[in-house]
Design a protein with these regions (language model features):
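A Zn2+-metalloprotease active-site environment signal
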Residues: 1-221
Length: 221
C-alpha cells in the first residue's frame, strides 16, 4: 500500500484487477462453466426455489423430463417463486425459469422460451455475457483499490456479476438465432413450434401495458 492525496492505495488489489481483466479476455469454456456454477449457486440461494412438491416445480419437471442434455451439455432446471417474467440459462447447463413467466404462458410457450435461453448457451452468447460481467467486476475491483470507496471484489463478486448479467443485452442477431434455436428445439421435442412466436407476442402485448423499466422485457432485450 501507498498513499496519493492522502488516500491509501492497495497496490495488490490494482494488480489483481489488472490480472482479472486480462484473464477475462481468455476465459475458457471450463472457466465459464465453473464461474456459472458459482453464480447459479448464488442465485439459487438468493431466490426462493419452488420445490418438487409445488405446482410450478411439478409443471417444470413435466415439461423438461425428456430434456436432460443438449449439444453434449447436461441440463438442470429450477423455477424461482418470484413475480418476474424472465428466464435464463448458464454455461454450466443450469436453466432457471421465473414464476411470473410460468403464470402467464402455456406449456408450449414456456418450453419455447427455455429453448431460446438454451440457444444463447449453445451459441456462446451466455459465455460472452459472463465474460462481460467478469470484466465489470474486475473494473469495480480496480475502483476499489482506493480503500474505503467500495467493498472488496472478493466480498461482492457474485453480487456484482448478478447485477451485470441482469442488465446484459444480446444483439439483434443473437436474439434472432436464439429464436430459431427455440423454434427447432420445440420441433425436436414434439412441441408446437409456434410457441416461440406466441411467447414473443405475449411479451409484446405486455410491454404495451407495463412501464418500460419493467424487468419482464429484459429477457428478449
Amino acid at each position: 500500500q501507498f498513499k496519493i492525496g492522502g488516500k491509501t492505495i492497495n497496490t495488490k488489489k490494482v494488480i489483481n484487477a489488472a490480472t482479472d481483466v486480462a484473464h477475462a479476455a481468455t476465459l475458457s469454456d471450463e472457466d465459464v462453466a465453473k464461474m456459472a456454477k458459482e453464480y447459479i449457486q448464488w442465485m439459487d440461494t438468493h431466490n426462493e426455489v419452488a420445490g418438487p412438491d409445488t405446482e410450478m416445480g411439478q409443471r417444470l419437471e413435466r415439461l423438461t423430463a425428456n430434456v436432460k442434455k443438449v449439444s453434449g451439455l447436461d441440463l438442470n432446471f429450477k423455477v424461482y417463486n418470484v413475480v418476474d417474467v424472465n428466464a435464463f440459462a448458464c454455461g454450466d447447463g443450469s436453466v432457471r425459469v421465473c414464476g411470473g413467466l410460468m403464470k402467464i404462458m402455456d406449456d408450449d410457450e414456456v418450453f419455447a422460451v427455455i429453448g431460446h435461453e438454451i440457444g444463447h448457451v449453445v451459441h456462446s452468447d451466455s459465455k460472452d455475457a459472463m465474460k462481460n460481467a467478469y470484466l465489470t467486476s474486475a473494473a469495480k475491483n480496480a475502483a476499489g483499490a482506493v480503500s474505503g470507496t467500495v467493498s472488496k471484489l472478493t466480498d461482492s463478486q457474485l453480487g456484482d456479476m448478478a447485477q451485470a448479467l441482469a442488465g446484459a443485452q444480446y444483439s439483434q442477431k443473437q436474439e434472432y438465432e436464439a429464436d430459431e434455436f427455440g423454434f427447432q428445439f420445440c420441433i425436436d421435442n414434439g412441441r408446437d413450434p409456434y410457441g416461440m412466436s406466441n411467447s414473443l407476442n405475449k411479451l409484446l402485448q405486455l410491454s404495451e401495458s407495463e412501464a418500460k423499466s419493467s424487468k419482464f422485457m429484459q429477457m428478449f432485450s
